[in-house]
UniProtKB/Swiss-Prot annotation:
Entry's family note: Belongs to the SAICAR synthetase family.
Name recorded for this polypeptide: Phosphoribosylaminoimidazole-succinocarboxamide synthase
GO biological process: 'de novo' IMP biosynthetic process; cobalamin biosynthetic process
Subunit structure: Homotrimer.
HAMAP family per record: SAICAR_synth
Organism (species): Escherichia coli (strain K12)
Biological function: Converts 4-carboxy-5-aminoimidazole ribonucleotide (CAIR) to 4-(N-succinylcarboxamide)-5-aminoimidazole ribonucleotide (SAICAR).
One Gene Ontology term, aspect cellular component: membrane
The enzyme's E.C. designation: 6.3.2.6
Record-linked InterPro entries: SAICAR_synt/ADE2_N, SAICAR_synt_PurC, SAICAR_synth, SAICAR_synthetase, SAICAR_synthetase_CS
Pathway(s) served: Purine metabolism; IMP biosynthesis via de novo pathway; 5-amino-1-(5-phospho-D-ribosyl)imidazole-4-carboxamide from 5-amino-1-(5-phospho-D-ribosyl)imidazole-4-carboxylate: step 1/2
Amino acid sequence: MQKQAELYRGKAKTVYSTENPDLLVLEFRNDTSAGDGARIEQFDRKGMVNNKFNYFIMSKLAEAGIPTQMERLLSDTECLVKKLDMVPVECVVRNRAAGSLVKRLGIEEGIELNPPLFDLFLKNDAMHDPMVNESYCETFGWVSKENLARMKELTYKANDVLKKLFDDAGLILVDFKLEFGLYKGEVVLGDEFSPDGSRLWDKETLEKMDKDRFRQSLGGLIEAYEAVARRLGVQLD
């Protein structure tokens, strides 16, 4: 399957059309951003690591009965995916307090959240992805009530699967975001799952093993990503 025209260039991925109108090529670049794209740097191997990491996670979720857009890997940095009509709202699950939640509520980082919190954010970099709720989604027509309920159900199901997967690898799944779209009327998981869009801490040391290493200038970003991948059993080379 050959990529054709560039359709969209995001902060870390590029989307291309193919000869099949139902399929796209997703290319993972070495770019890393923070502050809604205000700060961007390149890291060798990052595109490859995230592409293979994402394929591994999507495969595990598909095995658990969660529909995903993933078709197959095409190269070290590219995969073939179904073309989705993306919902402009992302789902976030929080198992522990971190990031914007800590700032917003003034609570201690790392406290366990039981049951996990479920948040919705409008995907809009210019507005810094404002937090919204189910009522906004219905009023503005971003997603139907039925499809939003399905997105929430699949997000919690993914959390159950991934918490155990990471726990078995000696990692805490602190929080993560998921994006969904519609494929022939069905709610399907799209975009990616990688350390770019999740928070992962070492169970013993609480060392941060995700993009917070870049956001907080901790260093060792790719080393952390590769360490997480190795613990999970992702084949990188």
